[in-house]
Amino acid sequence: MKSTDLISAFCRPVPFWSWNDKLEPDELRRQIGAMQDAGMGGFFMHARGGLETEYLSEDWFRAVEASVDEAKKRGMQAWCYDENGWPSGFAGGKLLEDPENRAHYLRFEKKPGFDAAALGVYTLENGHLRRVTGAENGISEYLCVYDCQNSSTVDILDLRITDAFLALTHEKYFERFGAEFGKGIAGFFTDEPQYFRYETAYTPVLLTEYKKAYGADVLDLLGALFVDCEEAPGFRFRYWRLMNVLYTENFMGRVYRWCLSHNCHLTGHTVEESELYTQMWCCAGVMPFYEYESIPGVDWLGRKTGTELAPRQVSSAAQQLGKKQVLTETFACAGWDVTPKELKRIAEWQYVNGVNLMCQHLYPYSIRGQRKRDYPAFYSEHNPWTDELKTFDDYFTELGYLLANSREQADVLILHPIHSAYLTFDRANDEASVRSVGEPFNVLIERFGAAGIGHHYGDERLMEKYGSVKDGRLTIGECTYSFVVIPDCGTLDSSTAALLKDYLSQGGRLMLAGRKPTRIDGEIADLSFLQGNLTWDELVRERALLPEANRDVRCTLRFAENGNFLFAVNLSETDTADMSVKLPFAGVESYDLLTHEMKAAAFERAADGIAAKLYLAPGESVLLMQNDSAIPQAQKSPIAETMELGGKWTRSAPVQNTLTLDKAALSYDGKMYTELLPVPYISERLLREKTNRKLWLRYAFTADFLPDDLTLELETLQHTKLSVNGTEISLTGQGVLDRSFVRGNIAALARKGENEIV
């Protein structure tokens, strides 16, 4: 399948479809139809907690077969998710059965005596680290580093383990559905692959790979990861750079090449992309990861936005590498009470920074039991505004299509400083250890975003592979830059230093935005050639689209065969934005993404283009399409019409009048009950107590009047008796909230006043 074919078929949102119960082909087909009705263009078949069909069993593959068949009939995209849970790599637990496959990490201890069990033992002498191989006179404190393992994840930096993962997962799909690869099955989603992030990561692969890369024994200075010494910056640089290489090449590169050789695509995301120090936890830099994806992706949790770092890292790499689509797995952990307005703001913040394809988290097969607590909200029939989902999805389909098929005006390159974080990163001190690099960088990129200066990030590994200089401009892959910005940083790769030296010698324009680096490849070096010749004020005059006082509006200027445009969004949740934006057009109109209508837009002509007027309410956005024949318009009042409300009004309920009983009293004998407790608390309490005995749960509600139809709906419960006001009943009707639920009319058993259900 060509990339262009994939884009035309895969422009609608594609949710995580949580396969979390006993999978029935007819129900799978029905849910696929519901997805299409909601404006979705496909799905990721994602094994998650609650799954009762055995993962990768014959029944599992029958479910896949039915889903692929239904997707083909409907012109939708079916994608495989490469794991049972996450992070990717452990093959549903099979690889964890062998201790040799488990992830490694390092533990550091100071001891009064030499410990032969340690991976490496060191002493500190006058600020220098020295490895010792036995007890020595005069050493009072031995610095010991231990190789430890964790039983929950595998060592994906080991090619042997990656190949085993592919054999146990991807090859199984190919054996069954090889003819559908690139047709009915678009490809695979990989989720949060990582080295062990909860301690200082390590892999035995380093014992050979470090010597190949640097001609030295990694154990000679391993203690420098934990001890500040003269050797620490250089060693840490070499260590973490190689860890990043092993992460991207031995896992992601290997999986990507397998997918390409089997006629399918790869998408997904790494983990903890939003800060430099969190990237150090997991992979030592996310941008090289994106080289090995057909559709690079990012993950964004919760209902807040952050700095532009996470979405702009992935979109920078995608544009440089010629990958049109950029995916976001988004909306997890936003909570049941999140509103469409909030979700629109979260998504548009990512889209204005270069994302263009939505993967909603989550579309559950079932919400029975704990399944309903799987990082909600859900974007399925369980959503109270499910009838409006299609409008929401249609909007982002149109926006994503326009962004994917356009080129961003971004000829400013900001060097990504993750390699400077290598010099000082210490897992024990975490964020504080790289704060001197991370904080100034966050301030800098927010300044660029607020000014509306189109920019990308330059990852030094990608620059080494794809960077070149010609006529005083720096190129990375398919993107060329007229300006380069060096943020506050401590080191440059030797390949980066060579590029910049060539760039400056050809008259390239360079801005130094902080501490000038003093090292190359982590070692002290002469960088006297690195002299800035560009100021912030000069860059603002030449490239800023937004006024200096702006805080909340972000924009992207786009050029495309079908029309050039500006997309702008007000990210504030409370403040209206009222400002002008400079555009290199002769005129603009406002484009409605839902109706496809063009409307007059306020602008006035200027010497070098126009000044378009923006008046954006909190969370509001606008798309201004170039139309050089448009006539300048004065800004109209945002209040189009006023009316006085009076008289009597009738309020209508858009859904059934329902009451959720989410608190219960717990008893172990049916006589003595606790106070009313939240049901999740009761569940956690029983798990802590490891209770395996008869229980009673008493729910209560009060009725002021008794309707003819008083329906009780609850989850299907095995080995359970149910009573209403002391009368035992059974419910047989199919539930409405979820098809696994049951319901029935209890009006005849209810009474005015207090009622109880046990």
Predicted regions and their residues:
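Carbohydrate-binding surfaces of carbohydrate-active enzymes
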Residues: 6-14, 22-30, 42-48, 55-93, ...
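Catalytic and substrate-binding clefts that recognize carbohydrates or anionic sugar/phosphate headgroups
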Residues: 90-179
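Aromatic-rich membrane-interfacial microdomains
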Residues: 730-743
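Extended low-complexity, serine/threonine- and proline-enriched intrinsically disordered segments
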Residues: 116-126, 588, 719-726
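Short, surface-exposed tryptophan/glycine-enriched loops
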Residues: 740-758
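Acidic/histidine-rich, surface-exposed loop or edge segments in extracytoplasmic proteins
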Residues: 10-16, 46-50, 146-155
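Aromatic-lined ligand-binding clefts that engage carbohydrates, nucleic acids, or primary amines
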Residues: 701-726, 757-758
